[in-house]
Amino acid sequence: MHQKTPEIYSVELSGTKDIVKTDKGDGKEKYRGLKNNCLELKKKNHKEEFQKELHLDDHKLSNRELEEKYGTDIIMGLSSTRAAELLARDGPNSLTPPKQTPEIVKFLKQMVGGFSILLWVGAFLCWIAYGIQYSSDKSASLNNVYLGCVLGLVVILTGIFAYYQEAKSTNIMSSFNKMIPQQALVIRDSEKKTIPSEQLVVGDIVEVKGGDQIPADIRVLSSQGCRVDNSSLTGESEPQPRSSEFTHENPLETKNICFYSTTCLEGTVTGMVINTGDRTIIGHIASLASGVGNEKTPIAIEIEHFVHIVAGVAVSIGILFFIIAVSLKYQVLDSIIFLIGIIVANVPEGLLATVTVTLSLTAKRMAKKNCLVKNLEAVETLGSTSIICSDKTGTLTQNRMTVAHLWFDNQIFVADTSEDHSNQVFDQSSRTWASLSKIITLCNRAEFKPGQENVPIMKKAVIGDASETALLKFSEVILGDVMEIRKRNRKVAEIPFNSTNKFQLSIHEMDDPHGKRFLMVMKGAPERILEKCSTIMINGEEHPLDKSTAKTFHTAYMELGGLGERVLGFCHLYLPADEFPETYSFDIDAMNFPTSNLCFVGLLSMIDPPRSTVPDAVTKCRSAGIKVIMVTGDHPITAKAIAKSVGIISANSETVEDIAHRLNIAVEQVNKRDAKAAVVTGMELKDMSSEQLDEILANYQEIVFARTSPQQKLIIVEGCQRQDAVVAVTGDGVNDSPALKKADIGIAMGIAGSDAAKNAADMVLLDDNFASIVTGVEEGRLIFDNLKKTIAYSLTKNIAELCPFLIYIIVGLPLPIGTITILFIDLGTDIIPSIALAYEKAESDIMNRKPRHKNKDRLVNQPLAVYSYLHIGLMQALGAFLVYFTVYAQEGFLPRTLINLRVEWEKDYVNDLKDSYGQEWTRYQREYLEWTGYTAFFVGILVQQIADLIIRKTRRNSIFQQGLFRNKVIWVGITSQIIIGLILSYGLGSVTALSFTMLRAQYWFVAVPHAILIWVYDEVRKLFIRLYPGSWWDKNMYY
């Protein structure tokens, strides 16, 4: 008979065709292609190459066909020679690491990004200005050369620092390498050998046992009770059985293939390697992350926006005054020098270093709070987050199944789900509990890994699946040494749990002093266990299982199931000694023992409980205007129960289904607007258009996506971003990588996360805790606030530095301040105070504000610019000019005499220039007085910048509400300002190249009234903002 050639089953492994898990009603999980997403991505990203197809038919082949295909022997394995040839041909069995940016490129990016460009332009303009001056005067001052060199040096030093910070985070990341197994047990040359897993090749025969990770894609040849955890690949949380049986066309669903890097939870398996390294399924998926581009961070956009503003203002003012200078009959070359001077005066030279240090300080603070920041700019992004799409397992929950409730003696008891299980309050004296605890202990294949004698019970590593681990630890805490109990009740026969039977059964020799007999114990799906029972134990005695007791059972079962908990039923049967003597041989294939008319003992339910810190964290998110969306592969009932327990769904919120149930009407009849919450399944999401998803995201504040695959996160993230939201996404699986890269900020789990997820993320949670994200949000908001304050502080003095050039050109005064003097303000006295603002504590309303809108709430907005430049900036300029005019008046030049004096003042051959009192001044004397004027203007700005620094501690609250001495680093900054000012004025007075002279002490106090005025003025501004929220004053004076 002609045999039809097996059809190759194509599995698309990308964010374009999704793998969606749906329940067909027969208990089997199905995966369906999400074509909508494919079309959207094709239209949107034009990335046909994003689709990668894996053609796999090995699961359909017989053992003989496999041997022929791979040239191997199932019993003897490959020869070492052949294995070496294949290794040379295919390369090592490891995933190619993501393409790394060369270190030199990373370094150069730090040199030319954001503020750096502005400083480089300033440096080149300085050199051009010197060139112009030198062309007409060979003895031209080298000030502009020095200024250009210093600006270049600032960029280089700051770039080195930023590069070092990011390299440090990268090095920490490289230490995470938990996903790939290191060793593999292989049969070669008829011998079992342990070799590095990287040396595996196709055709190798490998053996894997419970607790090991699968070292490659393998086709199962034989297995004993093997179950694997595929969650990092498919998002499937339930353990999946593995056998040599071909059960499904789809290789992702068939039982006879195990996938690279998934975990064997229990049992043993022997298999043939069919794919290695990048050719494995997980290798294909891991490569998808490179198909989704990194998005520019909000803070990078803000800095770019700020650079454009500063450059625009500088160039506009420069050109304006170039035109004025030319119209006032200045030489064109002189006018160009003025133009360059004005542009350079507008460049905030110290801000680049300040921003870099501020981001680094915050990153260090966050590392102490278990948030590892890979990209410094990601810190602020977290602060502007408006939607958090969070995993359930391990992030919102403790990532450990825990016994939550017990039902026996017709009562539901609440178990302690805290970290240590120490406070169990149910009745442990009941004889029914004694029987139930024995079943829980014996009908369990989980075991503690050896060598953990001193490790607390709840932290011990276990070989076994999550449910059995929960039962083992529960028994160990309450009953003591479980392994000792099992030794005393030796297991003589066992039927492992499987999806067909839906029960697990074991038979044990009893440690009965009155005579040996056998006890059969069973656990499994409650309805299946009840079917096998004719009696029920109540208060230690067996009673007939009648309709009344069955109804009580069903009520309890439905109540526990409705809580989203996984419920198991337990029963037992003492086998009669006369029918089953000590020498009896049990045969599990022949089933030569009874499996009906058993005694039902009780129910036990388990749940992965919420972390204790999460409800408070979710409440903080609500106050902060952040929408928290749960995205999980779990059952909708479980997801909804956890969402309610942590506050993602409020206690009084109802879904459409809840309303339908309450009113006893069909779901279609419910007005969707009456529902405040929504639980959307992956199956529903698969059939939704983008518009329908957008409608759900826009209309519901409380949303849970359940039964979704990790790939569907990409659709959800894109949907959120279409709402103009800044989206943070958590992920741990390989399949989460595209969503992590697409999100504004990707957050990987440090403990449970795969390497692919960590590589794609911007931030890694070292404790996998949702509360750490909220801490990060607060830190991110704080950094945005503090950057605003720093920029406002830095911009204020720009007007005071710019006005002297404008007055110099228009009014013709002797130059009030030189470019080198300005540099000492920007890179000397102001650097430490600017950095000190990074240490400022949060204002009281920081987590009660709505998230900032990325297109409207800018880092540098109109109120900030207007207030800094035209309010405080002009006050500073007036105060500094007051000191300048005071010095000149004291020396004999009254203000009216200085007007239009510039041309005569600067003539080298004029040595008899008369002041207001007729005294004659030589060129050298005038130059020394000019340097004294520089120093006076410098001191005037310095004194007022102290007041400016203090007022920048808050934007809304009074300084006295915030605490004047709460941030001690501010006072370090003020002290540094004064010390640097004193050193420049007195210690280096003889160094005329710096253009500073020794200043009389009284000149330091001339600007103090202006400094006090600045403080009082700002306190009044903040008072009116607090008194009249939403008013014109609030909108225009709150920056």
UniProtKB/Swiss-Prot annotation:
Subcellular localization, as worded in the UniProt entry: Apical cell membrane
TM annotation in the entry: 103-123, 147-167, 304-323, 336-353, 788-807, 818-838, 859-881, 934-953, 968-986, 1002-1022
PROSITE patterns: ATPASE_E1_E2
Keywords of the record: ATP-binding, Cell membrane, Hydrogen ion transport, Ion transport, Magnesium, Membrane, Metal-binding, Nucleotide-binding, Phosphoprotein, Potassium, Potassium transport, Sodium, Sodium transport, Translocase, Transmembrane, Transmembrane helix, Transport
Location of Phosphoserine modifications: 958
Tissue specificity as recorded in UniProt: Expressed in airway epithelial cells (at protein level). Found in skin and kidney. Detected in prostate basal cells (at protein level). Expression is increased in benign prostate hyperplasia and tumor tissues (at protein level).
Induction: Up-regulated by inflammatory cytokine IL13.
Active site (UniProt): 391 (4-aspartylphosphate intermediate)
Intervals, Lumenal compartment: 124-146, 324-335, 808-817, 882-933, 987-1001
Regulation of protein activity: The ATPase activity is regulated by monovalent cations and pH. Up-regulated by K(+) ions in a dose-dependent way. Down-regulated by Na(+) ions. Inhibited by Na(+)/K(+)-ATPase inhibitor ouabain and H(+)/K(+)-ATPase inhibitor SCH-28080 with an intermediate sensitivity to completely resistant Na(+)/K(+)-ATPases and highly sensitive H(+)/K(+)-ATPases.
Positions with a binding annotation for Mg(2+): 732, 736
NCBIfam families (UniProt xref): ATPase-IIC_X-K, ATPase_P-type
Protein name, per record: Potassium-transporting ATPase alpha chain 2
